[in-house]
UniProtKB/Swiss-Prot annotation:
GO biological process per UniProt: arginyl-tRNA aminoacylation; glycyl-tRNA aminoacylation
Enzyme class: ligase
PROSITE patterns for the chain: AA_TRNA_LIGASE_II_GLYAB (PS50861)
Pfam families: DALR_1, tRNA_synt_2f
Keyword Hydrolase: no
Gene: glyS
Lineage: Bacteria, Pseudomonadati, Pseudomonadota, Alphaproteobacteria, Hyphomicrobiales
Catalytic activity, reaction form: tRNA(Gly) + glycine + ATP = glycyl-tRNA(Gly) + AMP + diphosphate
Disulfide topology: none
GO cellular component: cytosol
Enzyme Commission code(s) on record: 6.1.1.14
Cell wall biogenesis/degradation found in the keyword field: no
Protein name per the record: Glycine--tRNA ligase beta subunit
Length: 699
């Protein structure tokens, strides 16, 4: 079947827009094809700085013919309705219509046959629409046509459109259409400087190969691989290791069509500036990679740049230009750093009085005071020194007002650590200045120093409680204050440091420090706990655990010790994987279902202890005895936080429960016996609630 080749050739597309633009082009074209009945076999899109390209293969040469029925008016309807029906369906007279028998009357039915069109004609119709409605985040108009109504908007001036369609074994046809005076053809262009001449192309394989000959690597993944491989080899040859940076690699691959890797250097005196600042300076300003000494691992005074040209002088001029700019930028960074060192962190804090954190939650200064108080309260719970924790919380945000962080926000916290160490603060205090922001994502490291943990928890819990208090909660996909990330951070801090904390108590303490109070003060900690439960389900699901087990544990009530919840969920999951667990779950659910039906029927519950005198069968007596023993054993194990032992105790219920359902008829003819047996079923449900609410567990 025929293939489509489409290229949109323009001035340089911003690197950050290229990946989404390629995906949008693929999606828009293929969606339209499918909507037109042209189901394709495969599609792939590409982007370089100067072009978007798409290949769609296995497109049918022609649309299928369509046959549809359209229902018209009833027989005997007014002439106006009949004439409207004939006009709408293209029928010459009612003789061409069918009659459909219906209980409501007999109706005219038009059989409409719509012959399929050639795929190339469909493409000529849909491609201009796609180009004109392309969803660029920012676009422009240009040239003489820009002032005319309906002129094309594109991210950068669009120069040429290549569009061919045909079988692999035949000469393809040009898809004939024009957009804003730009006619589609078979001509593209190579590298702007190395091979700018026009190139005639036929289909994708021919197109990609000719572009490569014209110094254009079409596939961004190939460009990334080439940059990474060449950069590593160049660094290795000089005795260095490349400091890899995936985000920078993605960006640089969008800046070049023909990547050429070169190495430059800067003066060693700049290495006195923190390595992270040097890296941020070189990355942000010149889009260059840094390297480290292969022996010591320390940052070296070299950098790797990626040019878009094979220079006749071997790249000397390009290197010199980059060195000149980097030298100036590093000089600025060094000045910022040295200026910052002249002012102590605590001396910066008064300025926070003029900085509003949130209009309802007060200034940054007020927030720092809250975090300091809360961190000091949390410190004994996590084994941290109270004085060091309070000091760390006091200084943790101070680096936000430094020159370096103002220039490079990504090093906030890290610079706080460097400045704290420079002014002689304790190592734990300095570490907390950096680590209190962590973890900032699922792959981010979790702090282990108790002081860092205490300040990190206080920072995140103050944020969560504060925004809960003013009813600024996440909704759907909107989470402007990153509260979901903060909650996951709290969960990871607790779980990975095996901390015992009552979230309800800590949340209440955080709430007490707020000047603003919610309408229902008592409700807030519980609402926040529900939010943590939802986040914990997300966390455990990503780790392969079942989210319904989290519901089963939280349903017990009073569960706000996340570490114990995680351990209980783990033990419950292992138990339910065993035959005893599966069968006990089935028995418990059967008991719950029977109880639900009978409670609804009788409009009452069957609470209270069964009457042993009414037991007439051995299976009843055996089950009652087993429940009594298991309840005592499981409760004792839970009290000792030995959840595995509690599950083992639960397993002892399986045989008597199975026997009871095999031999005993619950709904006995004697009302008293029936009631007693239903109470015994309720005892099964109550016994299992020592570890979880089994009714919340999915089969």
């Amino acid at each position: 079947m025929p293939d489509l080749l489409l290229e949109l050739f323009s001035e340089e597309i911003p690197a950050r827009m290229q990946a989404k633009a390629a995906d949008d082009l693929r999606r828009m074209v293929t969606d339209k094809l499918v909507a037109e009945g042209l189901v394709y076999e495969g599609a792939k899109a590409f982007a370089t700085p100067r072009r978007l390209a798409l290949t769609v293969h296995g497109i049918p040469a022609r649309q299928p013919d369509l046959k549809t029925e359209r229902r018209g008016p009833k027989m005997g309807a007014p002439d106006a309705a009949v004439q409207g029906f004939l006009k709408a369906t293209g029928l010459k007279s009612l003789d061409e219509a069918k009659i459909q028998r219906d209980p409501k009357g007999d109706f005219y039915i038009a059989l409409i046959e719509k012959p399929g069109r050639d795929a190339i004609d469909v493409l000529a119709e849909i491609l201009p629409v796609i180009i004109r409605t392309f969803p660029w985040p920012k676009s422009m108009r240009w040239g003489a046509r820009s002032g005319k109504p309906g002129s094309l908007n594109w991210v950068r001036p669009l120069h040429a459109i290549t569009a061919t369609f045909g079988l692999e074994t035949e000469e393809p046809d040009v898809v004939k259409f024009a957009v804003d005076g730009i006619e589609a053809g078979q001509t593209t262009y190579g590298h702007r400087f190395l091979a700018p001449a026009a190139i005639n192309v036929r289909r994708f394989e021919d197109y990609e190969a000719k572009l490569l000959d014209a110094k254009v690597v079409l596939d961004p993944e190939r460009r990334k691989d080439a940059i990474l491989t060449d950069a590593k080899q160049l660094a290795f040859a000089q005795g260095f290791d490349l400091v890899e940076d995936q985000n920078l690699l993605d960006e640089v691959a969008g800046l070049v069509e023909w990547p050429v890797v070169l190495m430059g250097s800067f003066e060693e005196e700049f290495l006195a500036t923190p390595a992270e600042v040097i890296r941020a300076t070189i990355r942000n300003n010149q889009k260059c990679f840094v390297v480290s000494d292969a022996k010591t691992g320390k940052l070296a005074n070299k950098f790797i740049l990626v040019a878009n040209i094979e220079a006749t002088d071997g790249g000397k001029t390009i290197i010199a230009g980059n060195e000149r700019v980097i030298r100036a930028r590093l000089s600025d960074a060094k000045f910022f750093y040295e200026t910052d060192l002249k002012t102590k962190l605590e001396d910066r804090l008064p300025k926070f009085e003029q900085i509003v954190f949130h209009e309802e939650l007060g200034t940054q200064a007020a927030r720092i005071t809250r975090i300091e108080r809360l961190a000091a309260e949390i410190a004994p719970l996590v084994g941290a020194d109270v004085a060091k924790t309070a000091r760390a919380a006091h200084l943790a945000k101070a680096d936000l007002l430094t020159e370096v962080v103002g220039e490079f926000p990504e090093v906030q916290g890290l610079m706080g650590k460097y400045y704290a160490l420079a002014q002689g603060e304790d190592a734990s205090v300095a570490a907390a200045c950096e680590e209190h922001y962590k973890p900032q994502g699922p792959a981010d490291r979790v702090p282990t120093d108790p002081v860092s943990v205490a300040v990190a928890l206080a920072d995140k819990l103050d944020t969560l409680v504060g925004f809960w208090a003013i009813d600024e909660k996440p909704t759907g996909s909107k989470d402007p204050y990153a509260l979901r990330r903060a909650a996951l951070g709290v969960i990871r801090l607790i779980a990975e440091n095996t901390l015992r904390l009552s979230l309800m108590k800590v949340a209440a303490s955080a709430l007490a420090g707020l000047s603003v109070k919610p309408a229902d003060v008592q409700k807030l900690p519980g609402d926040l706990l529900t939010f943590f439960a939802d986040r914990l389900k997300v966390q455990l699901r990503e780790q392969g655990a079942r989210h319904d087990l989290v519901d089963a544990v939280f349903a017990l009530g009073g569960q706000d010790d996340l570490l114990m919840i995680v351990r209980r969920v783990d033990a419950l999951g292992k138990f339910l994987e065993s035959d005893d667990g599966k069968n006990l779950l089935a028995g418990t659910k059967r008991a719950s279902n029977i109880l639900s039906i009978e409670e609804k029927k009788d409009k009452r519950t069957f609470d209270g202890a069964p009457d042993a005198a009414l037991y007439s069968l051995g299976e009843e007596k055996a089950l009652a005895k087993a429940i009594s023993e298991v309840q005592a054993e499981a409760s004792a194990s839970v009290a000792k936080e030995d959840f595995a032992a509690a599950m083992s105790a639960m397993a002892k219920l399986r045989p008597p429960v199975d026997a009871f359902f095999d031999k005993v008829r619950v709904n006995d003819d004697d009302p008293k016996v029936r009631e007693n047996r239903l109470k015994l079923l309720n005892e099964i449900r109550s016994a299992t609630r020592a570890v979880a609410d089994f009714s919340k567990i999915q089969d």
